[in-house]
Amino acid sequence: MMRILLFLATNMAVLVVFNIILSLTGIQAQDATGLLLMAALFGFSGSLISLFLSKTMALRAVGAEVIKQPRNDMERWLVNTVRSQAERANLPMPDVAIYHSEDVNAFATGPSKNNSLVAVSTGLLRAMTQDEAEAVLAHEVAHIKNGDMVTMTLLQGVLNTFVIFVSRMIAKVVSSNRDGESSTGIYFLVSMVLEILFGFLASMIAMWFSRYREFRADAGSAKLVGKHKMIAALQRLQRLHEPQELEGQLAAFAINGKRGGLAALFMSHPPLEKRIAALQQLDSFK
């Protein structure tokens, strides 16, 4: 996985544009209400754009092909399995796609429950048993059922708004002299530094929520197909070679996850052993 998530990169670009516009226009956003509205506008823009373009971006990022008409038994099984799970979850049928990769992975994306995508790699289909692959598909369907794509978009928008608003307010105080006049250069420098620092904190919050969301998707898979199948799928991932990582927002909705140490704070997924332990503690969904 790229260190900078694609989903967050779009928002970072919006922050840069926001700074450039304010600098060129000389707007200091002295009115806190005006600044808050401006921060919300720019804070949510990148997230919403990423959400609405998520399916197109995902298909292009991994070269996935949507199965419009199954051409073989594997494709028929994939489509029928996702259809069955979607019906049990009271969801409209998502698009189903396959992408060619040795990576053992799958992901879900899309702007809404009515316009979603489940994609799976050829590497996963070769490496996992049918029961294990079924559990992985159920995990992705659970992401859609839980509305995780929209929830992450809203959270990211709020975090972006916070980063812009607070950094600008602090920068104004720091750059103002005793006469109440602000130094544009100091204001711009301080606001940029603070946005970077607060941006890291915001990313930590977003990734914490992403990890929490993975536990919910695992439980959703257990509800659809039984927890023993989901546990088997996660155990399979443990036994396989460390998988290649997906780019950007795809990683946040994929099945696997890695990293340790300080980088664990920026992990989109909990460690596999913790996910397995959480499933084993479920009393239902045998």
UniProtKB/Swiss-Prot annotation:
Q: What is its EC number?
A: 3.4.24.-
Q: Which UniProt keywords apply?
A: Cell inner membrane, Cell membrane, Hydrolase, Membrane, Metal-binding, Metalloprotease, Protease, Transmembrane, Transmembrane helix, Zinc
Task: Classify the source by domain of life.
Answer: Bacteria
Q: What is this protein called?
A: Protease HtpX
GO CC annotation, single: plasma membrane
Q: Which family does it belong to?
A: Belongs to the peptidase M48B family.
Citing just one GO molecular function, the answer is: metalloendopeptidase activity
Per the UniProt record, the source organism is Pasteurella multocida (strain Pm70)
Q: From the record, give the transmembrane residue ranges.
A: 4-24, 33-53, 147-167, 186-206
First-level EC class: hydrolase
Active site at which residues?
Answer: E140
- Kindly state what the record says about how the cofactor is bound: Binds 1 zinc ion per subunit.
